[in-house]
Amino acid sequence: MEVKTFGILLTFFLLNRFSASAQDSTTTSITSRFDPSKPTNTYDRLSNNLEYNFLRNGSRTFGYRGNLVLASHDQRNSVHIEIPLLYSTFSQKFGLSDIRLRYYWIPYKHYSRKPGAFGLLLDTYVPTGSFKDGLGRGRWIFAPGLSTAFVFGRFSTFPIVAYLYSSEIKDAKTSSPGSEALSGYIIQSICVYKFRKSYLDCTPIFMKNSYSNSGKDDFVLEGNYLYMIKPNKMQLGFFARRYFLGNSTTLRAAWRIYF
């Protein structure tokens, strides 16, 4: 309960912190510069996701995942807050899963140059979901890292290198492989191809000492397609992720709204 309370309070703090510095763009400036295909371009938005997870132990979770992004006026700072409400077939219970918080600081962007951007990030999972009910991992996860960008016309790639720390699973009744604290790293690159009204991204990820594979290495592949149905305001999309060694799959249908 203390972890859930902390996660909720931290979420509201970040919301209040960034609402004061949220974007203040006119319709003209948004239209001329709006390009959400690049991860280093951040805009205030809410993504509503219907999610289905095929887990390693054969159970399933499904439900709603809200993803709120708040960006500063100059786009150098942004906070991403994910709040999942899922049902577990393992326990037949519905509830809050692990909240995910991400912070990005992008002090440099100049896409005509190589590299076209540089920044720092912090990715955190808060163990707000019940481990015994199959709704959470039961551990804190921290991944501070560096990001950059290379843009080649319609194609762009955004490499990220991050340190990965996963705390010990506190709710585990017995010690099992991978339940101890883990230390490793993540190497990934978000590869994006932009069409006229949509874009497709594919992200290969290598995780050293991964929480997704009992402390062993894992290879992950993510794919995301988004189509702009209302210019600069609304997108529909589909997301898929596969942990190949951790043997789990995530599917999402998304409705994204820009403010």
Locations of regions flagged by a protein language model:
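Short hydrophobic/aromatic patches at helix-to-coil boundaries
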Residues: 257-259
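Acidic/Ser/Thr-rich, low-complexity mid-to-C-terminal regulatory regions of eukaryotic proteins
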Residues: 172-176
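Transmembrane beta-barrel domains of Gram-negative outer membranes and organellar outer membranes
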Residues: 23-132, 137-153, 157-166, 182-225, ...
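Cleavable N-terminal export/targeting peptides
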Residues: 1-38
